[in-house]
Amino acid sequence: MADNYATAVLYKADIERELYNRATGVDAEDYILVDSLCAELSRCLGVDYRSFQDLRYKTIKNDACIPIISKYIPRFANIGFALELITQQFWRKGNKECSNFLERWTLELKANGRLSKAENALDNAFVKIQDKSKQDFLIGLICEKDAFPFTMEMLGRWKSEAALPVIIERLEVDTIKTSAITALGKYKDISLLPYIEPFINSTKAGERKAAARAVKQIKNLRIQ
């Protein structure tokens, strides 16, 4: 009940902020796109969404919304609109349409030098969707030195042999080291202990905890 109340309060505040932005011309072209998207969703799917906050707070259950929303995402000038739509509407486990679109859009953002702004939202989305057919593409993403930590951990859970050398290299990158340690633990491979165990004595608490957890996962497997 408390969570519902808090959500209702936040929703009301965000509606008021949206009304203010619309009245003062903030992100005016993007709100025109929002209105067009809401109208198309209503016309095609009978979805009664009347504001951007409806799209942010309420997930459309019908997967037929994905091709409609996909047409709009690349068109927003303020990328924040696109990322909110992805977070609320594209976290659909195993959905190939979501996965295929996000792959295309990621490559487009990368080509335009805008990927860093979308990285966190995309990282979470790929982990939620869990499309194993995209392993080669996902490995390409973690080849960037400090990018897509949750995707890297997911590749570890999948025990991706192709990703393993990249993950080991990431142990040298401070900003992503903890995720690399976590990912290695997911392989549950005794031969990886020499890469993990040195971090048990790290001066950084996050690295120590990740290493201890990873070693425990691997050693428990060995005992069994």
Feature annotation, model-predicted:
Residues 100-101, 117:
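Short acidic alpha-helical/loop segments enriched in Asp/Glu that coordinate divalent cations
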Residues 102-105, 137-139:
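Alpha-helical repeat scaffolds
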